[in-house]
Amino acid sequence: MVKKQGDSLQQEEFPLPKYVQETLSKHKISLSPTFGMGKVEGSLLDTLAFQTHRYPDVDMPYLLNQIAGWQTAKAKLPTWAANEDIIYPPHLSMEQCSSEQTAGYKLQLAARLLTTATGVNDASHALSQIVPGSLLVDLTGGFGVDFSFISRCFERAVYVEQQEKLCEVAQHNFQVLGLSQVEVVHADSTEYLHSLSHATLIYLDPARRNEQGGKTVLINDCTPDVITLESELLEKADTVMIKLSPMLDWHRAVDELNRIGDVVREVHIVSVRNECKELLIIIKQKSNDGEAEPLRIVCVNDGNAISYAALEAKDMQQKVIASPPVAGQFLYEPNTSLMKSGCFALLTERYDVAAVDVNSHLFVSETLTTDFPGRSFEITDVSSFNKKEVRRILSGITKANIAVRNFPMSVADLRKRLKLKEGGDVYLFATTDASGNHLLLVCRKV
């Protein structure tokens, strides 16, 4: 039985894949009774790998890959891991695939985009039932996680992948997942695009590895080359959704994509548990009246989303505190998506906070701002980096969590200088105020 996304899945609800169960049973291969419960898994896989000679009739590399894929899926794709009929692709595809959380976000985004492309009244309608006449084309199918989520609100959905083995894996899993309206196509994405007449939404997750197998973060180094194909993509689809590396400079990506005109409509910076996972860029042609929708930036961290117009933020001035922070004030660190967006002036407009300095990326307030999108702390002490002052505020403190913002030392160097172990309930922020003075802020988490 497969639980719906969002349902709680306990450890015992992750059965080994059926192929693994059958292979272990047939060849009398025994696993530790605690297998699947944590740290023993890696060493046990190594043990199995070294026992290949004992099981000549077993495709041990495939067996090990299925177990490793299932292990990854338990954290990344729990709904899939709970389905024993799912089969897993090679390690690289598992590493690159989206998590359920980020794939689910793309489903919600696609449903909203459908409302404008097809005239559906609201996104909840597109989420609850298939939109007639709609077509999704995923030109970079991969393991098919994103496709399996996004396709749910489309009448037809086409998965395109150039690796035949991945097509076979996807075809099997889509049937297991009950996706009856999908078509799997083994083809080169560019050639398929040339033959395509029209789609409601084209989705791409370009490969971010160069010919040597190393990772790349430049949009024009990815495969397929979105920059080269951009005009044709816009001709063939109402809307195009592009997933890019979280390491990419989104400002540069927008400039490169807008070289053919004002086509970038939205940039989504998506984080999970405060770790930036991906960038999503939405491009589309101007409306029939020739008006281009203003570019919007959406910063997402788990269930929290901050949206703003790029032009709105561009004209804002960041508010900076008139005097250095003091004990009793509250300190705020924006979440990762907001940090990547760079919309620091916007934060001082929307929330009752002010920056320690324009380059500090830290904010303070007199009273607690409970809805600030990030981490919140209470400042318990402040000092300069005068040795006597530092000794005073660190008296009795043996370990602390350290962060540096607009400060000329790394965390490692500062920790060594302060002679503090890592961890504990104390948080230290080293920064520079508006007068150029270096400060050490001692905080506790709120």
What are these regions (language model features)?
Residues 1-446:
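SAM-dependent transferase fold signal centered on methyltransferase-like domains
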